[in-house]
Structure formats: C-alpha cells, structure tokens
C-alpha cells in the first residue's frame, strides 16, 4: 500500500538490497553445496568414534558448516527486521496523529490537556452518545442548540446519566437494528 511517504522510498531501497543479496546467496549456494558433500563425508568417517559422546561433535560442526549461508541469511533477516520496524514506526505515527486530531475535535478539552488514548476514545464515545441523545430528543431552538443544553459529559439538560444510556441504546443509528 503506497502512502507517498518517505518510508515508500526506503522500502524500495530495501527490496533492491534483498534482490542483490539473493544473487550473492545463489552464487554462495553452489559453493556451499560442494563444501557440504566434503564435510558430510568427513562427518561420516569421524562419526563412529564420536557416537559414544552422544553426537556432540555433529552439533558443533553443523553451525560451522552453514556459516557462509547463515551470514547471508542473517543480513536478509536484519533487512526484513529493519523494514518491519520502519513500517511499525510509520503506522504508530499515523495512529498518533489520528488521536491528536480526535482530541482536538472534542469540545471542552483544552489543547494543553494530556489525555491517554483510552481517555480520548472514551470521551469521543461519550460525546457521540451525547450528540445522539440531543438528536433523539430534538432539542433544537430555531436550528440552534442552546449552550445550556450542552452539559456533556456529565448530564444532558438535567437528566441523569441512566436516562441518557436508555435513549442511546433505544436509538441505534447503525447496524442491523437500524430502521
């Protein structure tokens, strides 16, 4: 998915690096394959005396046998990890900006107030419920809502919060229960 951000250029560069690493890996695989047969034959010859120790020699030789290949795969894993980290940072940046915009759209929240994401979501949900309740009660005076009626988030024009919840659940605007 293209966002047109700097991370797209970085992703393209990382893909090009992976392609180059793939070419190196193919040329190394041929070299490693020829070495593997030589090392396997030496393991078979030396394997019978080492069986008494539980095959510890084989465990130690296995990583050295794969070291040329594992170096290339480690670089590939690191590139993939860096790409995933960059995508995650970009995702978190977008999410933080969205929460900032949501916080600034909420009335009665001063700009310098530090709200957690959970608090922001709760206030937004409460404000939406408040607006639904106003629409359900049709409290318009000449197309204008009087500020006295806007007592969110505590109560709506003198009604307790329990009445507000009943109105909100009774007047769902979306979903399968909408009429």
Curated annotation (Swiss-Prot):
Residues 20-87 are annotated as: Disordered. Residues 33-45 have a biased composition (Low complexity). GO terms for biological process: branching involved in ureteric bud morphogenesis; branchiomeric skeletal muscle development; bronchiole development; developmental process; diaphragm development; embryonic digestive tract morphogenesis; epithelial cell differentiation; gland development. It holds the Pfam family HLH. Residues 70-80 have a biased composition (Polar residues). It comes from the Eukaryota. One of its GO terms (molecular function) is DNA-binding transcription repressor activity, RNA polymerase II-specific. Residues 79-131 form the bHLH domain. Involved in epithelial-mesenchymal interactions in kidney and lung morphogenesis that include epithelial differentiation and branching morphogenesis. May play a role in the specification or differentiation of one or more subsets of epicardial cell types. This is Transcription factor 21. The gene is TCF21.
């Amino acid at each position: 998915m293209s966002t047109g951000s700097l991370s797209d250029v970085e992703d393209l560069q990382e893909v090009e690096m992976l392609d180059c690493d793939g070419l190196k890996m193919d040329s190394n695989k041929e070299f490693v394959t020829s070495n593997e047969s030589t090392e396997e034959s030496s393991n078979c010859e030396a394997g019978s005396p080492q069986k008494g120790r539980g095959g510890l020699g084989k465990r130690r030789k296995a990583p050295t046998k794969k070291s040329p290949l594992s170096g290339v795969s480690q670089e590939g894993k690191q590139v993939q990890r860096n790409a995933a980290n960059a995508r995650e940072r970009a995702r978190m940046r977008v999410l933080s900006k969205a929460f900032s915009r949501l916080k600034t759209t909420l009335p009665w929240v001063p700009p310098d107030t530090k709200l957690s994401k959970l608090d922001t979501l709760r206030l937004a949900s409460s404000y939406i419920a408040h607006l639904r309740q106003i629409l359900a009660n049709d409290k318009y005076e000449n197309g204008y809502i009087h500020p006295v009626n806007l007592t969110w988030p505590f109560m709506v024009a003198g009604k307790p919060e329990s009445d507000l919840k009943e109105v909100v659940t009774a007047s769902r605007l979306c979903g399968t229960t909408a009429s």
